[in-house]
């Protein structure tokens, strides 16, 4: 299997399977002399960690990260810093229950990657989905914690803005509420509604989709390049690579199709530090290059297909059958996708920052 690496100068390679011994990543291209400890990474991993509420999978993983290479204690300052060499990170799997999947080893789960992996490789890891499992995203979050160090001065934050058909009230958006509920929801009232709503979904054995919004502030103007190296193009690819993501938009996205030119164009006036934009329909990117405004992206997460309702499918021999998925699964995978989306945006920004410096300096 190829294509386990993304990025150009800030490159991330992830490895491992859901029910394997461990997962992890190698981050290549991180500049030297950046202070970095396991604690710097652990905080982000803890936000994504499963089993923290009844609204996520009950798989219990500590997700304790180990830095295997790429850092050392600076001989003069006594601070552990990056050396500029590849940074290898390891996260052990400790709560696999492969027996929960024995009944489906010869059946394709509808809506999962079972059939397509089998069609391409002639084999698939049925134990929790292998590489196609959301378990893989812990490695991305670990890499994203390093990327945040590279883009010091920029802030990348995410929020759950919709579950099923139910959207938050944007007039009630409060970033301080994100850590006060299990949904990463910025709307206090909607978070309470989501709790009741997801309880019903969970108890019925079903699942539901969601929309996540990522906002990056402090992004300088000039990141990205025209045509084939657009910042928004790389962001879209990075976010689309997350498990279960089926749609990505930048700025107003698909809603811009309903606007006139007068409504959509972000007008400008002279400000204290250069041009000041009067709106941000473009999501902080024009012509593939950042404008200096907040970079805004949203992605849609489909409902997981691992549900307790029997579904029609076929087996590996081509016979019709039914399947009932056992195991522990998220009723709404969009919840834990929030820190994953933040990590992917941070990695893309780190990559583009280094590419920008390499091309034009600064």
Swiss-Prot record:
EC number in record: 4.2.3.5
Amino-acid positions noted as binding FMN in the UniProt annotation, renumbered to this chain: 131-133, 243-244, 287, 302-306, 328
Q: Which GO terms describe its biological process?
A: amino acid biosynthetic process; aromatic amino acid family biosynthetic process; chorismate biosynthetic process
List of residues binding NADP(+): 48, 54
Q: How is the cofactor bound?
A: Reduced FMN (FMNH(2)).
SUPFAM superfamilies for this protein: Chorismate synthase, AroC
Which keywords are on file for this protein? Amino-acid biosynthesis, Aromatic amino acid biosynthesis, FAD, Flavoprotein, FMN, Lyase, NADP
Query: What is the uppermost EC class here?
Result: lyase
Catalysed conversion reaction? 5-O-(1-carboxyvinyl)-3-phosphoshikimate = chorismate + phosphate
Per UniProt, subunit arrangement is: Homotetramer.
Q: Which HAMAP family match?
A: Chorismate_synth (MF_00300)
Question: Which family, according to the similarity comment?
Answer: Belongs to the chorismate synthase family.
Name of the protein: Chorismate synthase
Q: Which gene encodes it?
A: aroC
